[in-house]
């Protein structure tokens, strides 16, 4: 078990462990894509070690990170303590039992970096913790959407990062629970490359009209380096 500390672009410390998925590009980019309003109550759904919750952190937000597994959640709690964050809470629970965890309509914004891959797709991750984070064996995309919709009030928003080849799976699941896509942005490794990541922000309730497809984000562009806080 090798632990390390990552300094995030916003200056916060993230404790990591080789047993669990470490900070990746997708969480960093989603944290920049998500636009919670001022003083919002925000839920990181399936937060793991808390990377996304810490990346999106602002002093005005009230953040809850929900995680099923003991190990990642313990690291998240250590990161909260190391950063002395009074507006961040780590909550253990199964998102499939959301009705027993958080009140209906209690959140303004949900963020989620979910398992990308179908449980039957490709090789398994090397540890049970990484399999849970990588593949939808513990919860499905549909169950994630149901959980997000339950905790959001009407007009609340949720932001997801996903694989483009499974985008329809996500959009279909969202539509079933009144989560209407309002912003979509694709991430490309180069100008010539097909997208490798897609980010979707949806709103609970309202018209299906008004979807905005934002300009693509190119890896290692000036904007990309700004997100990482790197002078280029």
Would you name each region that the model predicts?
Residues 32-123, 146:
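Conserved SAM/SAH cofactor-binding pocket of Class I
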Residues 192-232:
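SAM/dcSAM-binding transferase cores
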Residues 1-36:
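Class I SAM-dependent transferase core
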Residues 21-23, 46-49, 192-193:
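Short glycine/threonine-rich catalytic loop with a Thr-x-Gly-x-Asp
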Residues 114-143:
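Mobile active-site "lid"/loop adjacent to the S-adenosyl-L-methionine
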Residues 19, 138-195:
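Conserved Class I SAM-dependent methyltransferase catalytic core
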Residues 15, 89-91, 182-185:
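General small-molecule cofactor/ligand-binding pocket signal
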């Amino acid at each position: 078990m090798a632990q390390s500390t990552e300094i995030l672009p916003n200056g916060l410390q993230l404790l990591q462990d080789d047993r669990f998925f470490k900070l990746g590009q997708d969480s960093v980019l989603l944290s920049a894509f998500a636009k919670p309003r001022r003083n919002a109550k925000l839920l990181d759904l399936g937060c793991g070690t808390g990377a996304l919750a810490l990346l999106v952190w602002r002093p005005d937000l009230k953040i809850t990170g929900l995680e099923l597994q003991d190990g990642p959640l313990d690291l998240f709690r250590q990161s909260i303590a190391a950063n002395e964050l009074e507006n961040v809470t780590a909550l253990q629970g199964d998102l499939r039992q959301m009705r027993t965890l958080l009140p209906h309509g209690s959140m303004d914004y949900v963020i989620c970096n979910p398992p990308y891959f179908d449980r039957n797709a490709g090789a398994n991750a090397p540890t049970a913790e990484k399999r849970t984070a990588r593949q939808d064996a513990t919860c499905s995309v549909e169950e994630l959407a149901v959980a997000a919709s339950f905790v959001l009030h009407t007009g609340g928003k949720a932001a997801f990062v996903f694989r483009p080849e499974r985008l329809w799976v996500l959009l279909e699941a969202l539509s079933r629970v009144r989560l209407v896509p309002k912003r979509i942005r694709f991430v490309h490794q180069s100008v010539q490359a097909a997208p490798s990541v897609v980010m979707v922000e949806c709103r609970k309730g309202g018209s299906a009209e008004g979807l905005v497809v934002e300009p693509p984000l190119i890896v290692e562009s000036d904007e990309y380096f700004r997100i990482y806080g790197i002078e280029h």
